C-alpha cells in the first residue's frame, strides 16, 4: 500500500485553492462572446482548439497531488454542469472558484465553516427560486435560434441550423451531430430511432472523451431472451468477425459469461461490439424489438417462431448506417428497413391508437409511433481543416444541449445579468447568526464574477460595468459585450437557458461547500521511483483474433 501524505487546516485548503486557480485561470478566458480559444496538446494528431470550458477543464491534470485534488474538485463542477444542462461549464468554474476562495478567507479568519455553508445554501436556494420566477418559456423558431447562437459564441448559422433541425423533428426529436466530408454545414433528416437503454458495460465505449460506443455500418442482432452463454452464437459471431463490421446486440439482458466474453473480445480487438438491453417491458418490449427489426431489415430471434440462435445466419441480422450508444441511450441512424414495411407498421400502430381505451397504452403507442416515423435530424458540420471542423462540432454540440435546456425550463437574461440582479434579493434573507450572514455575503459577491469575467474578456473594466448595472432596477438591463453597449438583454436576444444558469450555480456551490468544510486532506505521497512496467510498444501482434 502506498504511503500517504496528510495535510490539515488552512494549509491544505490553500494548496487546494492553488490548484483551483490554475484550472479556473485556464477556463475563464473562454467566457463570453469575446472569450479566447485554448489550444490543447493531444497524445496523437493535431492539437485541439476549443472555447468549451469543460473540454479545457478535462484536459488539466497537475503534478502536485494536493493542488491536483483542488483542480479535480473544480473540474467536477464543470463536468456536472455539462452532464445536466449541457452548457454553463465556464460559469460554474468561475463561480466555484469565487465561492471557495472567499469562503476559505473567512474560515481562516475564525468563522464556522458549517454555518458559512448553511448561509451559502440559503442564498443559493433563494437565487434558484429567483431564476425560476424570471424564466420565460420559448416557443418561436427565432428564440430557439437565439439560444443556439449565444451558446455557440455568436455563430448565427449554428443557431439557425439547430432551430431548423428542431422544426423538422420536433423539440423532443432526436438530433445528432457529425462531421461532414466537405466545407458545408447542413441539416439532414434520416430514418432513425432512439430508445432509453445504454451499454451494459463501459468497456464497449469506443470514444472515451464522450463515453459513447460509435458503431459505423453495424450488424444488429435482436434476441428476445436473456443471453448468458455465447456458445449457441459462435457461428454468427464468427461470420460477423469475417465481415469486419461491428455488431450491436439487443436482448432482454446479456449477463455473466456472455457479457464477460464480449468485453474480452472487444478489448482484444477481435470483435467491435456493444450490447444493450431491449427497451420496454413484457409484451411492449417484444413490440418495440419488432419495430427495430422492421427499421433495420432484421429479424427478431424469438422462440415463439421456433427460431434458435445456433441456426441464425447473417441474413437475419439488421443493419444501419450508424449506431451511437451512450450510458443511457441508443440511437440507430438510417436503418436499412424497407420504406413500405415501415409505413405499414406505422399504419398498424395508428390503428391500435384509435382502438385503445387506455390513456397509458395510447401514450406508449404514440411514443413508438414517434420513434418509427419521426426520424433523426443530423447536423453535418464541415470546414477547411480537421482542427476547424472539430472545434466547430464541439460548439454545435454545446449549442444543441443549451437549446434543449432552454426548451425545457425557459430562458433568462444572459451575459451574467440574471445572477447579478438576483444577488440584490439576498439582502432580505433572515439568518440565525453572523456566520450564516457571512455565507450569504460570499454568494452576493461571487454572483458578480461571471459578468465581470465576460466584460474583462472583452477588454473593459468589469467592476465599473457591474456598478453601473446595479444602479438600475430593470432585471433585464445588461451589457452587450459583443457591441460594447448597455441594452435590454431579452430584447437584444442575449438570453441564457434558465436550466444552465441554475445548474452552474448549484454545482459551483456544492463544490465550494466541500472545499471550505474540508479540514484534512489525504493523498498518495509522491514517489521518486520510475514505473516498474516498461512502456508498451506499437504493433502488438496476435491481438486481432477471437477468444470465445
From Swiss-Prot:
Question: What are the protein's UniProt keywords?
Answer: ATP-binding, Chaperone, Cytoplasm, Isomerase, Nucleotide-binding
Task: Return the broad EC class.
Answer: isomerase
**Extent of Gly residues compositional bias:** 538-548
Disordered, as annotated region: 527-548
Q: Where in the cell is it found?
A: Cytoplasm
Q: Which InterPro entries match?
A: Chaperonin_Cpn60_CS, Cpn60/GroEL, Cpn60/GroEL/TCP-1, GroEL-like_apical_dom_sf, GROEL-like_equatorial_sf, TCP-1-like_intermed_sf
Which HAMAP family does this UniProt record tie to the protein?
CH60
What this chain does, per the record?
Together with its co-chaperonin GroES, plays an essential role in assisting protein folding. The GroEL-GroES system forms a nano-cage that allows encapsulation of the non-native substrate proteins and provides a physical environment optimized to promote and accelerate protein folding.
Q: What is this protein called?
A: Chaperonin GroEL
The top of its lineage is: Bacteria, Pseudomonadati, Pseudomonadota, Alphaproteobacteria, Rickettsiales
